[in-house]
Amino acid sequence: MKTTHRTRMPTTLEAFSPIIVMLLLLGLGYALFDLPAEPLMIISTVFAGFLVFKLGHCYLDILDAISEKIAKTMPALLILITVGLLIGTWISGGTIPMMIYYGLKAISPEYLYVTALFLTAIVSICTGTSWGSAGTVGVAFMGVAIGLDANLAATAGAVVAGAYFGDKLSPLSDTTNIASAAAGVDLYEHIAHLLYTTLPSFILSATVYVVYGLNYDFSNVATPEKVNTMIHELEQVYHFNFLLLIPVAIVLWGSITKKPTIPVMLLSAFIAIINAILIQKFSLSDVINSAVNGFDTSMIHHTSVSSDLSRLLNRGGMNSMMGTLLICFCALSFAGVLQLSGALTVIIQKLLTFVHSTLSLIITTILCGLTMIGVTCNGQISILIPGEMLKNAYVEKGLHPKNLSRTAEDSATIIEPILPWTAAGAYMAGTLGVATLSYLPWAILCWSGIIFAIIYGASGIGIAKLKK
Protein backbone atom coordinates (compact mmCIF):
# COMPACT_ATOMS: atom_id res chain seq x y z
CA MET A 1 0.00 0.00 0.00
CA LYS A 2 1.03 3.62 -0.46
CA THR A 3 2.55 5.81 2.21
CA THR A 4 0.05 6.82 4.89
CA HIS A 5 2.44 8.07 7.56
CA ARG A 6 4.34 11.33 7.78
CA THR A 7 7.02 12.16 5.24
CA ARG A 8 9.51 15.02 5.29
CA MET A 9 11.44 17.15 2.83
CA PRO A 10 15.17 16.44 2.41
CA THR A 11 17.84 18.71 3.78
CA THR A 12 20.04 20.59 1.33
CA LEU A 13 22.80 17.97 1.65
CA GLU A 14 20.32 15.12 1.20
CA ALA A 15 18.79 16.83 -1.85
CA PHE A 16 22.12 17.26 -3.62
CA SER A 17 23.51 13.82 -2.64
CA PRO A 18 21.79 11.80 -5.45
CA ILE A 19 23.07 14.30 -8.04
CA ILE A 20 26.59 14.11 -6.59
CA VAL A 21 26.50 10.30 -6.57
CA MET A 22 25.26 10.23 -10.17
CA LEU A 23 28.00 12.62 -11.33
CA LEU A 24 30.68 10.58 -9.53
CA LEU A 25 29.43 7.27 -10.94
CA LEU A 26 29.15 8.57 -14.50
CA GLY A 27 32.33 10.62 -14.27
CA LEU A 28 34.42 7.71 -13.01
CA GLY A 29 32.60 4.72 -14.43
CA TYR A 30 31.48 6.00 -17.83
CA ALA A 31 34.09 8.61 -18.68
CA LEU A 32 37.21 6.97 -17.18
CA PHE A 33 36.49 3.23 -17.27
CA ASP A 34 34.11 3.13 -20.24
CA LEU A 35 31.39 1.32 -18.28
CA PRO A 36 27.86 1.39 -19.74
CA ALA A 37 25.87 4.40 -18.55
CA GLU A 38 22.64 2.44 -18.00
CA PRO A 39 23.66 0.38 -14.93
CA LEU A 40 25.36 3.45 -13.45
CA MET A 41 22.09 5.35 -13.75
CA ILE A 42 20.26 2.42 -12.14
CA ILE A 43 22.70 2.48 -9.20
CA SER A 44 22.07 6.23 -8.90
CA THR A 45 18.33 5.53 -8.87
CA VAL A 46 18.77 2.92 -6.13
CA PHE A 47 20.71 5.45 -4.04
CA ALA A 48 17.92 7.99 -4.55
CA GLY A 49 15.47 5.24 -3.56
CA PHE A 50 17.21 4.76 -0.21
CA LEU A 51 16.90 8.51 0.37
CA VAL A 52 13.18 8.28 -0.41
CA PHE A 53 12.76 5.47 2.15
CA LYS A 54 14.59 7.59 4.71
CA LEU A 55 12.18 10.44 4.04
CA GLY A 56 9.19 8.23 4.85
CA HIS A 57 7.99 6.97 1.46
CA CYS A 58 7.38 3.33 0.53
CA TYR A 59 8.23 1.10 -2.43
CA LEU A 60 4.86 1.62 -4.16
CA ASP A 61 5.41 5.37 -4.02
CA ILE A 62 8.67 4.86 -5.92
CA LEU A 63 7.01 2.70 -8.58
CA ASP A 64 4.22 5.23 -9.02
CA ALA A 65 6.71 8.10 -9.32
CA ILE A 66 8.75 6.28 -11.98
CA SER A 67 5.63 5.22 -13.89
CA GLU A 68 4.26 8.76 -13.85
CA LYS A 69 7.53 10.24 -15.09
CA ILE A 70 7.83 7.73 -17.95
CA ALA A 71 4.15 8.13 -18.84
CA LYS A 72 4.56 11.89 -19.25
CA THR A 73 7.41 11.42 -21.75
CA MET A 74 5.90 8.42 -23.55
CA PRO A 75 4.81 10.48 -26.61
CA ALA A 76 8.44 11.56 -27.14
CA LEU A 77 9.66 7.98 -26.66
CA LEU A 78 7.14 6.79 -29.26
CA ILE A 79 8.44 9.48 -31.61
CA LEU A 80 11.96 8.04 -31.21
CA ILE A 81 10.71 4.62 -32.34
CA THR A 82 8.90 6.23 -35.28
CA VAL A 83 12.10 8.09 -36.19
CA GLY A 84 13.94 4.77 -36.55
CA LEU A 85 11.17 3.50 -38.82
CA LEU A 86 11.32 6.69 -40.88
CA ILE A 87 15.08 6.57 -41.43
CA GLY A 88 14.94 2.94 -42.59
CA THR A 89 12.13 3.62 -45.07
CA TRP A 90 13.68 6.86 -46.34
CA ILE A 91 16.87 5.02 -47.21
CA SER A 92 15.14 2.10 -48.93
CA GLY A 93 12.86 4.56 -50.74
CA GLY A 94 15.84 6.59 -52.00
CA THR A 95 15.01 9.88 -50.27
CA ILE A 96 18.18 10.19 -48.20
CA PRO A 97 20.49 8.78 -50.94
CA MET A 98 19.09 11.34 -53.41
CA MET A 99 19.97 14.24 -51.10
CA ILE A 100 23.49 12.91 -50.66
CA TYR A 101 23.89 12.24 -54.39
CA TYR A 102 23.11 15.78 -55.52
CA GLY A 103 25.05 17.24 -52.64
CA LEU A 104 28.22 15.38 -53.60
CA LYS A 105 27.83 16.46 -57.23
CA ALA A 106 27.68 20.12 -56.18
CA ILE A 107 31.17 20.25 -54.61
CA SER A 108 33.33 23.21 -55.75
CA PRO A 109 36.90 23.75 -54.40
CA GLU A 110 36.44 27.40 -53.38
CA TYR A 111 33.24 26.54 -51.57
CA LEU A 112 34.46 23.25 -50.11
CA TYR A 113 34.10 24.31 -46.47
CA VAL A 114 30.67 25.89 -46.76
CA THR A 115 29.48 22.99 -48.95
CA ALA A 116 30.65 20.58 -46.26
CA LEU A 117 28.64 22.60 -43.74
CA PHE A 118 25.46 22.64 -45.83
CA LEU A 119 25.53 19.06 -47.08
CA THR A 120 26.28 17.44 -43.73
CA ALA A 121 23.55 19.65 -42.24
CA ILE A 122 21.04 18.46 -44.84
CA VAL A 123 21.96 14.81 -44.38
CA SER A 124 21.86 15.17 -40.60
CA ILE A 125 18.44 16.86 -40.70
CA CYS A 126 17.11 14.11 -42.95
CA THR A 127 18.57 11.24 -40.91
CA GLY A 128 18.61 12.75 -37.41
CA THR A 129 22.11 11.40 -36.82
CA SER A 130 25.21 13.57 -36.52
CA TRP A 131 27.50 10.55 -36.27
CA GLY A 132 26.01 9.01 -39.40
CA SER A 133 26.36 12.12 -41.54
CA ALA A 134 29.90 12.82 -40.29
CA GLY A 135 30.92 9.18 -40.73
CA THR A 136 29.71 9.03 -44.32
CA VAL A 137 29.37 12.33 -46.17
CA GLY A 138 31.84 13.88 -43.74
CA VAL A 139 34.45 11.26 -44.55
CA ALA A 140 33.83 11.90 -48.26
CA PHE A 141 34.52 15.60 -47.72
CA MET A 142 37.73 14.78 -45.88
CA GLY A 143 38.77 12.80 -48.95
CA VAL A 144 37.98 15.80 -51.14
CA ALA A 145 39.97 18.07 -48.79
CA ILE A 146 42.99 15.77 -48.95
CA GLY A 147 42.79 15.67 -52.74
CA LEU A 148 42.58 19.46 -52.95
CA ASP A 149 45.30 19.99 -50.33
CA ALA A 150 42.77 21.97 -48.27
CA ASN A 151 42.88 22.80 -44.57
CA LEU A 152 41.84 19.52 -42.92
CA ALA A 153 41.05 21.11 -39.55
CA ALA A 154 38.72 23.64 -41.21
CA THR A 155 37.04 20.90 -43.23
CA ALA A 156 36.55 18.72 -40.15
CA GLY A 157 35.18 21.71 -38.22
CA ALA A 158 32.69 22.44 -40.99
CA VAL A 159 31.61 18.79 -41.08
CA VAL A 160 31.10 18.65 -37.31
CA ALA A 161 29.24 21.98 -37.33
CA GLY A 162 26.93 20.86 -40.14
CA ALA A 163 26.34 17.46 -38.58
CA TYR A 164 25.30 18.94 -35.25
CA PHE A 165 23.25 21.73 -36.84
CA GLY A 166 21.15 19.03 -38.46
CA ASP A 167 21.12 16.84 -35.37
CA LYS A 168 19.97 19.79 -33.26
CA LEU A 169 17.11 20.81 -35.57
CA SER A 170 15.97 17.47 -36.96
CA PRO A 171 12.61 16.12 -35.74
CA LEU A 172 14.25 12.71 -36.26
CA SER A 173 17.05 13.37 -33.74
CA ASP A 174 16.97 11.62 -30.37
CA THR A 175 18.43 14.60 -28.50
CA THR A 176 15.90 16.99 -30.05
CA ASN A 177 13.03 14.79 -28.93
CA ILE A 178 14.57 14.22 -25.49
CA ALA A 179 15.11 17.96 -24.91
CA SER A 180 11.51 18.82 -25.80
CA ALA A 181 10.21 15.96 -23.64
CA ALA A 182 12.36 16.86 -20.62
CA ALA A 183 11.12 20.45 -20.67
CA GLY A 184 7.54 19.45 -21.51
CA VAL A 185 7.52 21.36 -24.80
CA ASP A 186 5.95 20.48 -28.15
CA LEU A 187 8.60 19.09 -30.52
CA TYR A 188 8.06 21.55 -33.37
CA GLU A 189 7.72 24.49 -30.97
CA HIS A 190 11.09 23.47 -29.51
CA ILE A 191 12.69 23.25 -32.97
CA ALA A 192 11.33 26.66 -33.98
CA HIS A 193 12.71 28.22 -30.78
CA LEU A 194 16.12 26.65 -31.42
CA LEU A 195 16.46 28.82 -34.52
CA TYR A 196 17.10 31.91 -32.37
CA THR A 197 20.54 30.63 -31.37
CA THR A 198 21.23 28.03 -34.06
CA LEU A 199 20.51 30.10 -37.18
CA PRO A 200 22.85 33.01 -36.26
CA SER A 201 25.55 30.46 -35.40
CA PHE A 202 25.01 28.76 -38.75
CA ILE A 203 25.16 32.05 -40.67
CA LEU A 204 28.33 33.07 -38.79
CA SER A 205 29.90 29.70 -39.59
CA ALA A 206 28.92 29.86 -43.27
CA THR A 207 30.30 33.39 -43.59
CA VAL A 208 33.67 32.40 -42.11
CA TYR A 209 33.89 29.32 -44.36
CA VAL A 210 33.03 31.28 -47.52
CA VAL A 211 35.56 34.05 -46.80
CA TYR A 212 38.26 31.55 -45.87
CA GLY A 213 37.54 29.35 -48.90
CA LEU A 214 37.64 32.23 -51.36
CA ASN A 215 41.00 33.33 -49.97
CA TYR A 216 42.53 29.84 -49.83
CA ASP A 217 44.97 28.88 -52.60
CA PHE A 218 43.50 25.68 -54.02
CA SER A 219 45.42 23.57 -56.47
CA ASN A 220 43.57 22.70 -59.67
CA VAL A 221 42.85 19.13 -58.63
CA ALA A 222 39.96 16.97 -59.79
CA THR A 223 37.40 15.55 -57.39
CA PRO A 224 38.94 12.52 -55.63
CA GLU A 225 38.06 9.05 -56.89
CA LYS A 226 36.38 8.18 -53.58
CA VAL A 227 33.66 10.77 -54.15
CA ASN A 228 33.22 9.84 -57.81
CA THR A 229 32.89 6.19 -56.83
CA MET A 230 30.18 6.98 -54.28
CA ILE A 231 28.26 9.08 -56.83
CA HIS A 232 28.51 6.29 -59.42
CA GLU A 233 27.35 3.63 -56.96
CA LEU A 234 24.35 5.70 -55.91
CA GLU A 235 23.41 5.99 -59.59
CA GLN A 236 23.64 2.21 -59.95
CA VAL A 237 21.58 1.42 -56.85
CA TYR A 238 18.80 4.03 -56.96
CA HIS A 239 16.44 5.59 -59.49
CA PHE A 240 16.27 9.29 -58.67
CA ASN A 241 13.27 11.54 -59.41
CA PHE A 242 11.27 14.28 -57.67
CA LEU A 243 8.79 11.77 -56.21
CA LEU A 244 11.48 10.75 -53.72
CA LEU A 245 11.19 14.18 -52.08
CA ILE A 246 7.50 13.74 -51.18
CA PRO A 247 8.35 12.10 -47.80
CA VAL A 248 10.50 15.14 -46.93
CA ALA A 249 7.76 17.52 -48.06
CA ILE A 250 5.28 15.74 -45.79
CA VAL A 251 7.54 16.16 -42.73
CA LEU A 252 8.16 19.83 -43.58
CA TRP A 253 4.41 20.38 -44.06
CA GLY A 254 3.72 18.76 -40.71
CA SER A 255 6.35 20.95 -39.06
CA ILE A 256 5.02 24.19 -40.57
CA THR A 257 1.36 23.41 -39.88
CA LYS A 258 2.17 21.90 -36.45
CA LYS A 259 0.34 18.67 -37.14
CA PRO A 260 0.76 15.75 -34.68
CA THR A 261 4.29 14.42 -35.10
CA ILE A 262 3.72 10.65 -35.11
CA PRO A 263 0.91 10.55 -37.74
CA VAL A 264 2.93 12.87 -40.00
CA MET A 265 6.02 10.65 -39.72
CA LEU A 266 3.98 7.49 -40.32
CA LEU A 267 2.46 9.04 -43.46
CA SER A 268 5.92 10.03 -44.67
CA ALA A 269 7.20 6.50 -44.01
CA PHE A 270 4.23 5.01 -45.89
CA ILE A 271 5.00 7.10 -48.99
CA ALA A 272 8.68 6.10 -48.71
CA ILE A 273 7.64 2.43 -48.60
CA ILE A 274 5.64 2.89 -51.80
CA ASN A 275 8.67 4.56 -53.43
CA ALA A 276 10.92 1.70 -52.31
CA ILE A 277 8.63 -0.92 -53.85
CA LEU A 278 7.46 0.83 -57.04
CA ILE A 279 10.49 2.99 -57.93
CA GLN A 280 13.49 1.29 -56.31
CA LYS A 281 12.10 -2.24 -56.89
CA PHE A 282 12.86 -3.57 -53.42
CA SER A 283 10.69 -6.45 -52.21
CA LEU A 284 8.00 -5.86 -49.59
CA SER A 285 9.92 -8.13 -47.22
CA ASP A 286 13.12 -6.07 -47.56
CA VAL A 287 11.26 -2.78 -47.12
CA ILE A 288 9.49 -3.96 -43.97
CA ASN A 289 12.80 -5.30 -42.65
CA SER A 290 14.33 -1.84 -43.31
CA ALA A 291 11.58 -0.27 -41.22
CA VAL A 292 12.13 -2.66 -38.32
CA ASN A 293 15.83 -3.55 -38.33
CA GLY A 294 17.25 -0.84 -40.59
CA PHE A 295 18.36 -0.80 -44.21
CA ASP A 296 21.18 -3.14 -45.19
CA THR A 297 23.06 -3.08 -48.48
CA SER A 298 22.77 -6.88 -48.62
CA MET A 299 19.26 -6.14 -49.91
CA ILE A 300 20.88 -4.77 -53.09
CA HIS A 301 21.29 -7.69 -55.48
CA HIS A 302 21.85 -6.12 -58.91
CA THR A 303 25.21 -4.46 -58.18
CA SER A 304 28.09 -4.57 -55.72
CA VAL A 305 28.39 -1.90 -53.04
CA SER A 306 31.58 -0.51 -51.49
CA SER A 307 32.20 -0.40 -47.77
CA ASP A 308 31.96 3.42 -47.84
CA LEU A 309 28.45 3.33 -49.29
CA SER A 310 27.48 0.56 -46.87
CA ARG A 311 28.55 2.77 -43.96
CA LEU A 312 26.33 5.49 -45.39
CA LEU A 313 23.23 3.38 -46.00
CA ASN A 314 23.28 0.69 -43.29
CA ARG A 315 21.22 2.41 -40.62
CA GLY A 316 17.73 3.19 -39.37
CA GLY A 317 14.95 0.86 -38.25
CA MET A 318 12.88 0.86 -35.07
CA ASN A 319 15.34 -1.46 -33.34
CA SER A 320 18.12 1.12 -33.78
CA MET A 321 16.38 3.29 -31.17
CA MET A 322 16.31 0.67 -28.43
CA GLY A 323 19.64 1.79 -26.94
CA THR A 324 18.43 5.38 -26.76
CA LEU A 325 15.14 4.27 -25.20
CA LEU A 326 16.99 2.26 -22.56
CA ILE A 327 19.12 5.20 -21.41
CA CYS A 328 15.96 7.35 -21.39
CA PHE A 329 14.13 4.86 -19.17
CA CYS A 330 17.08 4.75 -16.75
CA ALA A 331 17.43 8.54 -16.60
CA LEU A 332 13.67 9.06 -16.25
CA SER A 333 13.55 6.52 -13.41
CA PHE A 334 16.23 8.51 -11.60
CA ALA A 335 14.36 11.76 -12.25
CA GLY A 336 11.08 10.24 -11.03
CA VAL A 337 12.56 9.07 -7.72
CA LEU A 338 14.37 12.39 -7.32
CA GLN A 339 11.13 14.29 -7.80
CA LEU A 340 9.30 12.05 -5.29
CA SER A 341 11.95 12.77 -2.67
CA GLY A 342 11.37 16.51 -2.98
CA ALA A 343 15.05 16.96 -3.81
CA LEU A 344 14.26 18.85 -7.02
CA THR A 345 12.15 21.34 -5.08
CA VAL A 346 14.95 21.93 -2.56
CA ILE A 347 17.57 22.24 -5.33
CA ILE A 348 15.43 24.69 -7.30
CA GLN A 349 14.74 26.80 -4.21
CA LYS A 350 18.46 26.90 -3.48
CA LEU A 351 19.27 27.83 -7.09
CA LEU A 352 16.61 30.53 -7.15
CA THR A 353 18.34 32.31 -4.28
CA PHE A 354 21.19 32.97 -6.73
CA VAL A 355 18.95 33.57 -9.75
CA HIS A 356 17.61 37.11 -9.86
CA SER A 357 17.16 37.64 -13.59
CA THR A 358 16.56 35.89 -16.89
CA LEU A 359 20.27 36.14 -17.68
CA SER A 360 21.32 34.44 -14.44
CA LEU A 361 18.81 31.63 -15.05
CA ILE A 362 20.12 31.12 -18.60
CA ILE A 363 23.71 31.09 -17.30
CA THR A 364 22.72 28.62 -14.56
CA THR A 365 21.23 26.33 -17.21
CA ILE A 366 24.37 26.62 -19.33
CA LEU A 367 26.60 25.78 -16.36
CA CYS A 368 24.41 22.78 -15.49
CA GLY A 369 24.59 21.54 -19.09
CA LEU A 370 28.36 22.06 -19.35
CA THR A 371 28.94 20.33 -16.02
CA MET A 372 26.74 17.37 -16.96
CA ILE A 373 28.27 16.87 -20.40
CA GLY A 374 31.80 17.45 -19.11
CA VAL A 375 31.44 14.93 -16.29
CA THR A 376 29.01 12.32 -17.65
CA CYS A 377 30.09 12.52 -21.32
CA ASN A 378 26.52 11.53 -22.21
CA GLY A 379 24.46 13.99 -24.25
CA GLN A 380 21.09 12.41 -23.48
CA ILE A 381 21.56 12.43 -19.71
CA SER A 382 23.01 15.95 -19.91
CA ILE A 383 19.73 17.14 -21.43
CA LEU A 384 17.30 15.06 -19.37
CA ILE A 385 18.56 15.83 -15.87
CA PRO A 386 18.90 19.66 -16.16
CA GLY A 387 15.54 19.68 -17.95
CA GLU A 388 13.88 17.91 -15.04
CA MET A 389 15.73 19.97 -12.42
CA LEU A 390 15.12 23.44 -13.83
CA LYS A 391 11.69 23.19 -15.46
CA ASN A 392 9.84 24.64 -12.47
CA ALA A 393 12.44 27.37 -12.03
CA TYR A 394 11.59 28.72 -15.49
CA VAL A 395 7.87 28.56 -14.75
CA GLU A 396 8.33 30.41 -11.45
CA LYS A 397 10.21 33.15 -13.30
CA GLY A 398 7.37 33.42 -15.85
CA LEU A 399 9.52 32.01 -18.66
CA HIS A 400 8.33 29.44 -21.17
CA PRO A 401 10.04 26.04 -20.75
CA LYS A 402 11.09 26.14 -24.41
CA ASN A 403 13.79 28.60 -23.29
CA LEU A 404 15.07 25.78 -21.09
CA SER A 405 14.98 23.12 -23.81
CA ARG A 406 16.83 25.45 -26.20
CA THR A 407 19.53 26.35 -23.69
CA ALA A 408 19.93 22.70 -22.69
CA GLU A 409 20.74 21.84 -26.30
CA ASP A 410 23.03 24.86 -26.66
CA SER A 411 25.08 23.77 -23.65
CA ALA A 412 25.04 19.98 -24.09
CA THR A 413 24.08 18.60 -27.52
CA ILE A 414 26.46 20.67 -29.63
CA ILE A 415 29.20 21.01 -27.00
CA GLU A 416 29.80 17.26 -26.78
CA PRO A 417 31.75 16.88 -30.09
CA ILE A 418 34.30 19.57 -29.18
CA LEU A 419 35.31 17.94 -25.88
CA PRO A 420 38.15 15.45 -26.53
CA TRP A 421 37.20 13.08 -23.68
CA THR A 422 33.57 12.54 -24.73
CA ALA A 423 32.41 9.70 -26.98
CA ALA A 424 31.33 12.20 -29.64
CA GLY A 425 34.66 14.04 -29.53
CA ALA A 426 36.61 10.80 -29.80
CA TYR A 427 34.35 9.53 -32.60
CA MET A 428 34.64 12.70 -34.68
CA ALA A 429 38.41 12.84 -34.24
CA GLY A 430 38.84 9.17 -35.15
CA THR A 431 36.39 9.23 -38.05
CA LEU A 432 37.58 12.47 -39.65
CA GLY A 433 41.27 11.97 -38.86
CA VAL A 434 41.69 15.37 -37.17
CA ALA A 435 42.29 15.92 -33.44
CA THR A 436 39.35 17.36 -31.53
CA LEU A 437 41.27 20.42 -30.32
CA SER A 438 42.46 21.06 -33.90
CA TYR A 439 38.96 21.30 -35.39
CA LEU A 440 37.45 22.95 -32.28
CA PRO A 441 38.09 26.58 -33.43
CA TRP A 442 36.54 25.77 -36.82
CA ALA A 443 33.43 24.09 -35.39
CA ILE A 444 32.05 27.58 -34.87
CA LEU A 445 28.42 26.54 -34.56
CA CYS A 446 29.21 24.24 -31.64
CA TRP A 447 30.53 26.95 -29.31
CA SER A 448 28.87 30.12 -30.59
CA GLY A 449 25.37 28.96 -29.59
CA ILE A 450 26.22 29.59 -25.93
CA ILE A 451 27.35 33.12 -26.77
CA PHE A 452 24.06 33.91 -28.50
CA ALA A 453 22.13 32.31 -25.62
CA ILE A 454 23.84 34.67 -23.15
CA ILE A 455 23.23 37.69 -25.42
CA TYR A 456 19.54 36.84 -25.63
CA GLY A 457 19.37 36.28 -21.89
CA ALA A 458 20.86 39.73 -21.28
CA SER A 459 18.79 41.58 -23.89
CA GLY A 460 15.52 39.68 -23.60
CA ILE A 461 15.46 39.08 -27.35
CA GLY A 462 14.22 35.61 -28.25
CA ILE A 463 13.12 34.89 -24.67
CA ALA A 464 9.56 33.53 -24.63
CA LYS A 465 7.32 34.45 -21.71
CA LEU A 466 4.53 32.30 -20.31
CA LYS A 467 1.09 33.51 -21.34
CA LYS A 468 -1.06 34.43 -18.36
Curated annotation (Swiss-Prot):
Q: Which UniProt keywords apply?
A: Antiport, Cell membrane, Ion transport, Membrane, Sodium, Sodium transport, Transmembrane, Transmembrane helix, Transport
Q: Where in the cell is it found?
A: Cell membrane
Q: How does it sit in the membrane?
A: Multi-pass membrane protein
**Which Pfam families does the record match to this protein?**
Na_H_antiporter
Q: Does the keyword Cell membrane apply?
A: yes
InterPro entries under this entry? Answer: Na/H_antiport_NhaC (IPR004770), Na/H_Antiport_NhaC-like_C (IPR018461), NhaC_Na-H+_Antiporter (IPR052180)
Major site of localization recorded for this protein = membrane
Q: Return the GO cellular component terms, semicolon-separated.
A: plasma membrane
One of the entry's Gene Ontology molecular-function terms is: sodium:proton antiporter activity
Show the stretches that span the lipid bilayer.
13-33, 40-60, 76-96, 112-132, 141-161, 194-214, 237-257, 260-280, 328-348, 354-374, 414-434, 443-463
The similarity comment for this entry is: Belongs to the NhaC Na(+)/H(+) (TC 2.A.35) antiporter family.
Name the chain's protein.
Answer: Uncharacterized Na(+)/H(+) antiporter HI_1107
Q: What is the lineage of its organism?
A: Bacteria, Pseudomonadati, Pseudomonadota, Gammaproteobacteria, Pasteurellales
